[in-house]
Amino acid sequence: MQALQASRLTGQARPCSSSVVPRCSSLHVSRPISSGVSSSQELSSRSSAPATKSWRSSGRVITRATATAAPSELDDVGVSAAAESIIQYAINFARASETYEVHSWMVLMGILKYETCTAAKILKSLGLEDLYGAWNEVLWALNVCDGLQPRSFVTDIKFADRAFKVITAASDFAVWHGKDKMYSEDVLMALAAGGVLEDLFPDLNLSFERVRKAVEKESGRRYQLPDETEEAGPLKSEDDVSFL
């Protein structure tokens, strides 16, 4: 498949003239989440809650967080090497670009960067074959939304609300999938639940349900959401972390 055309993002990335990070709909994954989740159900306004020095959220209320390193534990699950590398990539990208704030799109760029992780393989199976081209499209979209506008130097890098909600939601998906660690496909599920993938690649139908089915096919086990009847099955594969 030819490189994806950047023009298809025109009008999808909602510009924000004064914001350092694009405000293209903030992700909110409610608990419990229904099997019929849609992007419109996941959207909420940015929170004004102060930053904390933890990746976890008190009382399951998601807040912005100081990002010093990828977490060794989030809520009740650990973090796989692949998921940690993806999140750390987003942190390093925010530092290198001098924005000092991680945006959800930067998390997606981490998936696109590590082409051998499970999430990247799933995206390819869903039609996003040119991962390098897609990475450049997301970078272009960040520029359009002023998401790479330099800020004054700060020692701490923070997560924007939407990015932090993606990571926290990913830990929930890991639990619902019966795993003791968050894997890259859980991060992908959280991005899909918030409509991040559909916003950036509207012509590929990367809806939550379609991504969910692809993840379940790859893993050999369905995601058990809180309001659904349990269906047991073996988990046949996890992330390939050979790129580390």
Swiss-Prot record:
Bias type Low complexity, positions: 30-48
SUPFAM superfamilies: Double Clp-N motif
Keywords for the protein's UniProt record, in alphabetical order: Chloroplast, Plastid, Transit peptide
Transit peptide: 1-64
Gene Ontology cellular-component terms listed: chloroplast
Gene3D superfamilies linked: Clp, N-terminal domain
Keyword Iron included in the entry's annotation: no
Coiled-coil residue spans: none
Disulfide partners: none
InterPro entries per the UniProt record, alphabetical: Clp_N_dom_sf
Compartment list: Plastid, Chloroplast
UniProt key word Plastid: yes
Protein family membership: Belongs to the ClpA/ClpB family.
Function, as annotated: Accessory protein regulating the assembly of the plastid Clp protease system.
Protein name: ATP-dependent Clp protease ATP-binding subunit CLPT4, chloroplastic
Organism of origin: Chlamydomonas reinhardtii (Chlamydomonas smithii)
Gene for this chain: CLPT4
